[in-house]
């Protein structure tokens, strides 16, 4: 287990260094940072002094080492557009994205697993066909179209839910949350459904496929021959073995939910990191773009690492393999 953990940490460090190199190239070579920070009437002397202060005259290797060291301390410089530390901007926007992603993930898992189990056990029932139809729609339609449709129905026609914004938020130390207010909860419903629907359909179809495969195995037939109850067979044996690959997919999809919340946040004008990234692209705010890239990569690596640890606990074969290599 220790060797497995060390190997995964080493692989995670390699991934982060690679992403840091890409972010540095974006930061260093996509336009001149000085031109982004000063106006056209700035004198040449001031420009040269600013380049010296920013360390842009240093060798590229020195600049990259400094960039990695600063990123390790969560210091991403100053935003060109907002003239504020990028870390402060991300700290202000991150709670909105994290809450949206977690609620969307709970929606996807909370509905996807039961629907997948039901459609796997009751293949010919009418409700199973309804669930499969919903999953097909969720996979087929693009996220922005789902969001626009939900806004049209529930905000424009029915007027029961807000179409944009986060609602009222409450400050809890460094964290601002909308989960403790009625308007915040109402504002979260449509974006969470929009973001989580595609993930829910993936979980549903994966659980169904795994259930169908497991129910055909010999040990399930043996369990039936022993006279075990329907509940013990389907939930004690079949579902338990189904969840091994599902855990991996759910973990990776949680990272995808955070990374690809950009579209949902843009449609609903949700004040999170995704909308921040879009605004940074529009304004060529390179420090914010580089910080977002590094942060998303870090979240992917962290989630993948935690999933690997859970996977080792769930599936003993991984531990055996790890000792053999």
Roles of regions detected by a PLM:
Residues 2-4, 16, 94-127, 175-325:
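Alpha-helical transmembrane segments of integral membrane proteins
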Residues 12, 93, 97, 133-140, ...:
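Residue-level signal for discrete positions within transmembrane alpha-helices
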Residues 15-65, 154-180:
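Hydrophobic alpha-helical transmembrane segments of membrane transport/permease proteins
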Residues 16, 20, 24-28, 144, ...:
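Membrane-embedded alpha-helical segments of multi-pass transporters/permeases
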Residues 44-74, 220, 269-280:
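Short hydrophobic, aromatic-rich alpha-helical segments embedded in or entering the lipid bilayer
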Residues 52-60, 77-86, 168-188, 281-287:
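Membrane-interfacial helix-loop-helix junctions in multi-pass membrane proteins
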Residues 57-113:
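An internal, D/E-rich "acidic patch" concept
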Residues 133-141, 145-200:
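Membrane-water interface segments at transmembrane-helix boundaries in multipass membrane proteins
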């Amino acid at each position: 287990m220790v060797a497995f953990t060390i190997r995964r940490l080493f692989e995670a460090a390699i991934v982060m260094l690679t992403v840091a190199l890409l972010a540095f190239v974006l930061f260093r070579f996509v336009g001149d940072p000085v031109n982004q920070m000063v106006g056209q009437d700035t004198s040449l002397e001031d420009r040269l002094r600013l380049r010296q202060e920013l360390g842009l005259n240093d060798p590229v290797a020195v600049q990259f080492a400094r960039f990695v060291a600063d990123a390790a301390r969560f210091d991403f410089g100053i935003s060109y557009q907002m003239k504020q530390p990028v870390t402060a901007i991300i700290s202000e926007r991150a709670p909105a994205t994290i809450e949206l992603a977690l609620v969307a993930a709970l929606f996807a898992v909370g509905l996807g697993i039961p629907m997948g189990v039901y459609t796997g056990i009751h293949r010919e029932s009418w409700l199973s066909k309804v669930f499969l139809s919903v999953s097909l729609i969720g996979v087929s339609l693009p996220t922005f179209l789902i969001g626009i449709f939900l806004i049209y129905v529930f905000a424009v026609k029915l007027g029961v839910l807000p179409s944009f914004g986060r609602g009222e938020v409450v400050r809890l130390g460094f964290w601002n949350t909308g989960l403790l207010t009625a308007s915040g909860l109402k504002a979260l419903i449509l974006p969470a459904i929009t973001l989580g629907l595609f993930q829910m359909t993936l979980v549903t179809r994966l659980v169904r496929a795994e259930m169908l495969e497991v129910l055909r195995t010999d040990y399930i037939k043996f369990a039936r021959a022993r006279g075990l109850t329907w509940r013990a067979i389907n939930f004690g044996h079949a579902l338990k073995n189904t969840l091994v690959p599902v855990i991996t997919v759910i973990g990776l999809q949680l990272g995808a939910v955070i990374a690809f919340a950009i579209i949902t946040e843009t449609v609903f004008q949700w004040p999170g990191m995704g909308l921040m990234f879009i605004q940074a692209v529009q304004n060529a705010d390179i420090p914010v773009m580089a910080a977002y890239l590094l942060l998303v990569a870090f979240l992917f690596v962290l989630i993948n690492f935690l999933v690997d640890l859970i996977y080792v606990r769930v599936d003993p074969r991984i531990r055996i393999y790890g000792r053999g290599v």
